[in-house]
Amino acid sequence: MSAGRKIVVVDGGLSTQLESMGCDIDGPLWTARALQENPTAIEAAHRAFISAGADVIITGSYQVSRQGFIEAGHAADDADRALGLSVEIARRAAEGTSTVVAASVGPYGAISHDGREYKGNYGLSERQLADFHRERIEFLVAAAPDMLAIETIPDVREAEALAVALEDFAGFPAWITFAAKDEGHVCAGQTIEEAVAVAQSIPGIERVGINCTAPVHVNGLIDRITAATSLPVIVYPNAGGTWDSLSGHWLGVTHEDIVRCAREWRDHGATWIGGCCGTEAEGIGAISEALRAA
């Protein structure tokens, strides 16, 4: 139980919010496309989450990397600029508020735009993965976010590589969240306890948890995480619906469903709570209102 603990509301799915605003983010760069083509929309999306009650916003850098930009036909320095710009935009949106700006560090598989971020097992060495993440983190940290959001990590081996990469950043504050396939395992198959053990070894990690995961698994995952660590727990799972590509909306999810789940996650011990794919600003508003009223 988290009785007496302060609940912090994390924002929702940036891509979901952008799509709800009519933005076209299809293609290999996903939300990174909007960083280049429509930065004002990114800022508006951040502002929408803040207005809805989010205490923490996550930058649009999830899918930004030199490798990904080069493969999409852009220059490497375009990626470097986009990383810094993602933090700058979030800072502008949060100006005049106490909102925490967390710079997104997505998994290696996100550059493929084919779902590999939910599988892991990339066939790369620890050094290759560490180098990939280090060059991104360098530009994000230089832009001075409040912390890093290392998110949607599907494989303990990638977390181990991130531990190596983060040694160069003197314990810069961060959280790490894993993508899970059931109540006990991350997507690549290792146990959540193995993932937590690695998380605790990473310099600067202040909280650990779950994101981009079906909500049905989250209560059990929180229970196992809290049994394995004293680190605070953060969860921002998917909304749990089905994406309808024709309508451009998530189907089968109500705000009542989202609120019910958020209350359960709080009661199981999570203290930072938000949403991921399928949760737009209106859903975060419902979570914020419900958790602050309880």
Set out the residue ranges of the language-model regions.
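Domain-level signal for soluble alpha/beta catalytic cores
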Residues: 1-294
